[in-house]
């Protein structure tokens, strides 16, 4: 037998060893594939977790500062239509409706093609109006996004970000957005400020400047945050939200999101680079129209 020719026993042993190594490598490959699949699943989880989202635009005619605000024309279209058209561009929403207690607003919205849900005049705020509208919807939704009707330039990306952040934070029942606070807005009580923790969860909201240093002046080097008027709710939580009793901080600041925090619930916050362009008073309309002209928005 040639020296280099293996015996039958050694051939079997070599073959067995090779097979073992193949199975080990195969097992490692399967393990790596399984790990990769698990990571991919976690990354893609938003497509299955809280997957269905509805955008609700609460609108009321009565307002102490600006009566009939939803119907005010902005470059030829009612403001509520401008807002609805922007919201319809959000890719994360399965459905968009306007919730109102005023037939004038409802008729206007139906005229440009929006779905409308009539709600009672007893709703204390937009969140309660969204809750009532949610209960009247035929389909089930996991997330409800409350988009204020006086945001004719709202960016669809903000809506998508609010939805995605709630999908990726199972311990949160509420999500919202902030942007950088402009120095001139530091002490404007109509501009709500926010502070967040290192994980992106809300700590507090205030009409005053927060954090507030002992000098009593705004720190030009500190990245203060401005709260944007958008809220994403876990639909189960939204249904119980109106039943939660008012809280001291909520009533003192007149900020409904504080009721969420004071009752021990978690709120996810995303930071965006878009400015706030809400219409709070009649003089804001001209500013919005000028901005739209510069952006060539028809």
UniProtKB/Swiss-Prot annotation:
Molecular functions per Gene Ontology: 3-deoxy-manno-octulosonate cytidylyltransferase activity
InterPro entries, per the entry: Cytidylyl_trans, KdsB, Nucleotide-diphossugar_trans
Pathway info: Nucleotide-sugar biosynthesis; CMP-3-deoxy-D-manno-octulosonate biosynthesis; CMP-3-deoxy-D-manno-octulosonate from 3-deoxy-D-manno-octulosonate and CTP: step 1/1
Keywords, alphabetical: Cell wall biogenesis/degradation, Magnesium, Membrane, Nucleotidyltransferase, Transferase, Transmembrane, Transmembrane helix
Record-annotated membrane-spanning stretches: 22-42
EC number in record: 2.7.7.38
UniProt key word Transmembrane helix: yes
Tissue occurrence: Ubiquitous.
UniProt cofactor(s): Mg(2+)
Keyword field contains Transmembrane helix: yes
Reaction equations catalysed: 3-deoxy-alpha-D-manno-oct-2-ulosonate + CTP = CMP-3-deoxy-beta-D-manno-octulosonate + diphosphate
Topology in the lipid bilayer: Single-pass membrane protein
pH dependence: Optimum pH is 9.5.
Any one biological process term the GO annotation gives: CMP-keto-3-deoxy-D-manno-octulosonic acid biosynthetic process
Domain of life of the organism encoding this protein: Eukaryota
Compartment list: Membrane
GO cellular component term, pick one: cytosol
HAMAP family given in the database record: KdsB
Physiological role: Catalyzes the production of the sugar nucleotide CMP-3-deoxy-D-manno-octulosonate (CMP-KDO). CTP is the preferred nucleotide donor, and it can partially be replaced with UTP but not with ATP. Activates KDO during the biosynthesis of rhamnogalacturonan II (RG-II), a structurally complex pectic polysaccharide of the primary cell wall. RG-II is essential for the cell wall integrity of rapidly growing tissues and pollen tube growth and elongation.
Extra facts: Rhamnogalacturonan II (RG-II) RG-II is a structurally complex pectic polysaccharide present in the primary cell wall. RG-II consists of a linear 1,4-linked a-Dgalacturonic acid backbone with four distinct side chains, two of which contain apiosyl residues. Boric acid forms a diester with two apiosyl residues from separate RG-II molecules, thereby covalently cross-linking two RG-II molecules as a dimer.
Family, similarity comment: Belongs to the KdsB family.
Name of the protein in question: 3-deoxy-manno-octulosonate cytidylyltransferase
Organism expressing this protein natively: Zea mays (Maize)
């Amino acid at each position: 037998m040639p020296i280099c020719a293996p015996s039958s026993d050694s051939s079997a042993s070599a073959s067995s060893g090779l097979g073992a190594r193949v199975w080990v490598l195969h097992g490692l490959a399967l393990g790596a594939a399984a790990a990769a699949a698990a990571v991919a699943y976690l990354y893609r989880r938003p497509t299955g977790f809280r997957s269905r989202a509805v955008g609700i635009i609460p609108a009321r005619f009565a307002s102490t500062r600006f009566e009939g605000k939803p119907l005010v024309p902005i470059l030829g279209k009612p403001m509520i239509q401008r807002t609805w058209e922007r919201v319809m561009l959000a890719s994360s929403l399965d459905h968009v409706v306007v919730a109102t207690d005023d037939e004038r607003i409802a008729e206007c919205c139906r005229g440009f093609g929006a779905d409308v849900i009539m709600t009672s005049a007893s709703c204390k705020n937009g969140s309660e109006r969204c809750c009532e509208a949610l209960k009247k919807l035929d389909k089930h939704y996991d997330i409800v996004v409350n988009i204020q009707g006086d945001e004719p330039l709202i960016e669809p990306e903000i809506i998508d970000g609010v939805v995605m952040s709630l999908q990726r934070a199972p311990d949160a029942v509420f999500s919202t957005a902030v942007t950088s606070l402009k120095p001139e807005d530091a002490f404007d009580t109509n501009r709500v400020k926010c502070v967040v923790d290192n994980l992106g969860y809300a700590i507090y909201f205030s009409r005053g400047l927060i954090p507030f240093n002992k000098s009593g002046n705004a720190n030009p080097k500190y990245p203060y945050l401005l709260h944007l008027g958008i809220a994403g709710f876990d639909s189960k939580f939204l249904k119980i939200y109106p039943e939660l009793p008012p809280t001291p901080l909520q009533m003192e600041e007149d900020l409904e999101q504080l009721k969420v925090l004071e009752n021990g619930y978690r709120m996810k916050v995303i930071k965006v680079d878009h400015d706030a362009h809400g219409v709070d008073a009649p003089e804001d309309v001209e500013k919005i129209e000028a901005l739209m002209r510069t952006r060539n928005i028809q």
